[in-house]
Amino acid sequence: MANTLHKVERLDKKKIIEKMFAGGSRSFSVFPLRVVYLPVEELEADASILISVSKRRFKRAVKRNRVKRQIREAYRVNKHELLNALAEKKCRLAIAFIYLSDQLTESSVIEERVKTALARIVER
């Protein structure tokens, strides 16, 4: 399995995103991330992700983009365990990673937290 993040693995359907945040989804926090996920059958990929960094916390787009890049990279490297579990269960998930902190965080810390979050999703 390749370590790439394809376009179909990015969540961009407005209808699914609205459904995720309107209710019916599950969520938990692994500071500095809040993870919201929802089983959705109409996705093309087994897991599609959305990454959000608040403009209120980081005024500069450069910093927001850095955080998004760190989360995306951590997910890309560690997604295999999640994808294997989803293939076993024949389930598809929409996952949103929301960055909560107002401080920049090292990539190693974010990767550790993303691993923890993915493990918790696999448990449930």
Task: Annotate each predicted stretch with a short phrase.
Residues 1-124:
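Positively charged, solvent-exposed patches that mediate nucleic-acid binding
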